[in-house]
């Protein structure tokens, strides 16, 4: 299979599973796009293990342990400069998933082909993948997050890790301090995940999960059940509105604090980070405008809305909106 065919299949996987990220990732040059499709496929493996229905926590834990062991092996091979795979491993590996290589071992084999190539070809920090696994482990025994510090830790592990990996693949301009760029990338990833949390309150609650800071809920005299009841009732509840607006404001503030990141990435990644961020900012904006409705029904952008954002990003027309 030639490269263009493989990339087309990889793009289909990402389009189907990563409905928001796809619109930005497809704006990248082929090599970077293929690398991040492979990264997404790996992230999808651990996410699917943690969220698998009809599977007990012991089995989920064993699945994550298996992926961790294989990931550590790949990282060790990178450190020993022993990753000897062909230049088309990313496309071939992820393409195997698109062809329906099967669940379990076959699927993971395909993903790890891609991971080997990513770690070989880009200066990606292997520890980010291990931190992402720890983030999924936090979901194995759902619990209340006592305060924002705990919520932020979860966001860092499941989302900011991805942001930092993206930065390693995108690259930064020659005059940019990489450490500062990584700090801003962390903030952007946290803002993305806070948006996900606010979007998915009802869905997470059904899974026995709540990522909202418990102390802030208590300070407003409410529980998650109160939030869900508020969304279903006809009467207004100022406490719920106040809480939701404060959560949205925090996420918007963190987006704003990371605004300088967009000008730091390599020129060929500017449109991508712009599109991805604009899509998430628009989801957050819709939640903030009507949080009660957002609690009742998951906020989504249509394919047309996301395509329009991506087009504006490609043309450099998104502006500096935070």
Sequence positions of predicted segments:
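Catalytic cores of Mg2+-dependent Asp-rich isoprenoid enzymes
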Residues: 1-82, 89-193, 198, 202-322
